[in-house]
């Protein structure tokens, strides 16, 4: 198994992907910290608003803007005084607003869109928006020239493929024929002129009138008004989407599939890797977190003297020794199970597998993140 050092040296974008609950966010932060330690100007973009993760990076809370990690805290964690590490949480609304302002024909047109209640719902709730905006924000960070590397922690999802599919689903929704019919202006096509245009216009009005009766208000007319105002940006969204797809497939991008050593989770990670390869996304390796490593066997005869030396009362030594031996047996059974999962991953990518053992406590500070990174870079042998 190789370590991640070459990837951290050469990549411009690292995407940590996988199902929820496998340690993606912690892994992304640990990778970003190691990259900063090597001298690269690094930003980590997370979707996880957890205060605990922000605290582990030395921040009070995440914001929608990149925040520079205090240099004194980085020095205390073993980095040089000129190391540069920033972190931010995705703010979907702010990212979408920036796109509208950037691509609208003028300020008045941007304001009409931004103030529309349907846009406000669209920019935060429509399926695929979060994933689309995450990569859009990455593109902005890289284009700023302030960072050598951006690490993207993908949104939590039941299935890791949601991250790859969601932006395309979003654009397909915007291209939907029914949506186009709602917002299409009367003079948008060569056939929509004269009597035909009037007939089509009356048809729309009749449909809207019927739907408004069902919804209790001018819902669809208002929606059509929003879509017509927003339609001028559709091509910009399509263009941005193509640029995003190019970025995700670039030679300087790598996807790290994060998993945990549970059979179902490993199967999904292996399938996700196959889909990455099939779709032309650059696979950078598996990271398997929380792996139980085997411990040497012991006996009550060996434990009792150790308990006595630790000051455990006479009548408690034998029962405690039995409990400790039972716990050791349980641990080694889980280690055997985890070893099977590691073998399954190694069969697929033997040189691209990185293992982080189960740590004695949760990662809650820069030292903990540094320890995770040390395992990924092979500085700590398992």
Task: Explain the meaning of each model-derived region.
Residues 1-8, 205-228, 238-382:
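C-terminal lobe/tail of nucleotide-utilizing enzymes
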Residues 1-15, 22, 27, 31-235, ...:
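Nucleotide-state-sensitive switch-loop elements of NTP-binding domains
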Residues 15-17, 119-124, 253-258, 327:
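Glycine- and acidic
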Residues 17, 45-47, 152-155, 256-260, ...:
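Generic beta-strand/beta-sheet core signal
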């Amino acid at each position: 198994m190789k370590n991640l050092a070459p990837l951290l040296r050469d990549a411009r974008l690292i995407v940590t992907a996988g199902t929820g609950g496998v340690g993606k966010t912690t892994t992304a932060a640990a990778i970003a910290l190691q990259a900063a330690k090597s001298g690269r100007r690094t930003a980590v973009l997370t979707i996880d608003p957890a205060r605990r993760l922000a605290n582990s990076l030395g921040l009070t809370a995440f914001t929608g803007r990149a925040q520079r990690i205090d240099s004194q805290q980085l020095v205390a964690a073993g980095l040089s005084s000129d190391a540069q590490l920033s972190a931010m949480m995705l703010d979907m609304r702010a990212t979408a607003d920036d796109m509208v302002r950037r691509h609208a024909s003028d300020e008045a047109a941007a304001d009409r869109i931004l103030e529309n209640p349907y846009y406000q719902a669209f920019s935060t709730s429509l399926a695929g928006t979060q994933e689309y905006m995450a990569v859009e924000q990455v593109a902005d960070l890289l284009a700023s020239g302030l960072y050598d590397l951006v690490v993207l922690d993908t949104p939590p999802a039941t299935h890791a493929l949601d991250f790859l599919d969601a932006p395309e689903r979003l654009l397909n929704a915007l291209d939907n024929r029914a949506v186009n019919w709602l917002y299409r202006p009367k003079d948008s096509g060569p056939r929509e002129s004269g009597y035909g245009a009037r007939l089509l216009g009356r048809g729309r009005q009749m449909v809207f009138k019927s739907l408004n009766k069902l919804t209790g208000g001018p819902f669809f007319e208002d929606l059509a008004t929003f879509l017509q105002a927003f339609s001028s940006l559709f091509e910009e969204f399509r263009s941005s989407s193509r640029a995003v797809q190019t970025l995700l497939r670039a030679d300087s991008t790598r996807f790290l599939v994060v998993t945990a050593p549970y059979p179902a989770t490993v199967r999904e990670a292996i399938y996700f890797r196959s889909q990455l390869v099939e779709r032309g996304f650059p696979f950078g390796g598996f990271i398997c977190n929380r792996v139980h490593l085997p411990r040497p066997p012991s006996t009550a005869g060996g434990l009792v003297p150790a308990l006595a030396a630790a000051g455990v009362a006479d009548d408690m030594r034998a029962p405690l020794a039995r409990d400790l031996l039972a716990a050791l047996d349980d641990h080694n059974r889980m280690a055997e199970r985890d070893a099977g999962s590691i073998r399954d991953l190694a069969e697929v990518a033997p040189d691209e597998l990185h293992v982080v053992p189960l740590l004695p406590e949760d990662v809650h500070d820069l030292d903990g993140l540094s320890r995770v990174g040390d395992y990924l870079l092979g500085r700590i042998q398992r």
